[in-house]
C-alpha cells in the first residue's frame, strides 16, 4: 500500500498534541465543548430572530390584506352618503298626494340638482358631446344622419354618458353625421 503524504493541519496537529498529553487533551476537549455551546447558543439566537422576523412579516401581510379589504368594502361609502338626500327627496315627492304639477316639477328639479351635486362630489362627469368629433371610446353611435357638419361629428345625444376620472362609466348614445 502506498503511504499518502499528509501535511499536518492545525486541527490535526492540535489533536495529535492533545493525544500526547492527557492534561492538554482534557483542556482541548473543554475548550471545544465551550466553543460548541457558544455556537449552539448563537444559532438558537439567530433562529429565534428568524422566527420573529417571519412572524412580523406575516403580521404585516395580514394587516395589509385587511386594510385593502376594508378600502374595497367602504370605498363607495362617501358616494352613497351623497345619494341619501336624493333618495329622501324622491320619497318626499312620492308621498305628496296633492297632484300639483308645478310643485312636482320644482321637486324634480331640486332632486336633479342634488344628484348633480352628488355626482360632482363623487367626481362623476357628464358626457354631452354635441358638436364634438365622434370618439368610439367615449361615445356609442346609434345611427348616422345626413348633416351639414363635418363627417363623424356628434349631431344629437340620445342618452348622456358619464365618466369618473378618465374611465367611462357609460358611453353617450349619439347620432353621428354621415359622410357626404
UniProtKB/Swiss-Prot annotation:
Keyword Cell membrane among record annotations: no
Function according to Swiss-Prot or TrEMBL: Participates actively in the response to hyperosmotic and heat shock by preventing the aggregation of stress-denatured proteins, in association with DnaK and GrpE. It is the nucleotide exchange factor for DnaK and may function as a thermosensor. Unfolded proteins bind initially to DnaJ; upon interaction with the DnaJ-bound protein, DnaK hydrolyzes its bound ATP, resulting in the formation of a stable complex. GrpE releases ADP from DnaK; ATP binding to DnaK triggers the release of the substrate protein, thus completing the reaction cycle.
Compartment(s): Cytoplasm
Homology family: Belongs to the GrpE family.
Keywords: Chaperone, Cytoplasm, Stress response
UniProt xrefs under CDD domains: GrpE
SUPFAM superfamilies: Coiled-coil domain of nucleotide exchange factor GrpE, Head domain of nucleotide exchange factor GrpE
Keyword Chaperone in annotation: yes
GO cellular component: cytosol
HAMAP family in the cross-refs: GrpE (MF_01151)
Organism this protein belongs to: Cupriavidus metallidurans (strain ATCC 43123 / DSM 2839 / NBRC 102507 / CH34)
Membrane-traversing stretches: none
BP GO terms, sorted: protein folding
Identification of the protein by name: Protein GrpE
Gene3D superfamilies the record matches: 3.90.20.20, Head domain of nucleotide exchange factor GrpE
Biased composition (Polar residues): 1-14
An MF annotation (GO) of this entry: adenyl-nucleotide exchange factor activity
Domain of life: Bacteria
Subunit details: Homodimer.
Stretch list, region Disordered: 1-30
Amino acid at each position: 500500500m502506498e503511504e499518502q503524504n499528509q501535511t499536518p493541519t492545525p486541527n490535526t496537529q492540535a489533536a495529535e498534541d492533545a493525544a500526547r498529553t492527557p492534561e492538554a487533551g482534557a483542556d482541548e476537549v473543554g475548550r471545544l465543548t465551550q466553543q460548541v455551546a457558544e455556537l449552539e447558543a448563537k444559532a438558537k439566537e439567530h433562529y429565534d430572530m428568524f422566527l420573529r422576523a417571519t412572524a412580523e412579516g406575516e403580521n404585516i401581510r395580514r394587516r395589509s390584506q385587511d386594510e385593502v379589504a376594508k378600502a374595497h368594502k367602504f370605498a363607495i361609502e362617501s358616494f352613497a352618503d351623497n345619494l341619501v338626500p336624493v333618495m329622501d327627496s324622491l320619497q318626499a315627492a312620492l308621498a305628496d298626494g296633492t297632484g300639483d304639477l308645478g310643485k312636482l316639477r320644482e321637486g324634480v328639479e331640486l332632486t336633479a340638482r342634488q344628484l348633480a351635486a352628488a355626482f360632482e362630489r363623487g367626481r362623476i362627469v357628464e358626457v354631452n358631446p354635441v358638436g364634438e368629433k365622434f370618439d368610439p371610446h367615449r361615445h356609442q353611435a346609434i345611427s348616422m344622419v345626413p348633416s351639414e357638419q363635418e363627417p363623424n361629428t356628434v349631431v344629437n345625444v340620445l342618452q348622456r354618458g358619464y365618466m369618473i376620472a378618465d374611465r367611462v362609466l357609460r358611453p353617450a348614445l349619439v347620432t353621428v353625421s354621415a359622410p357626404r
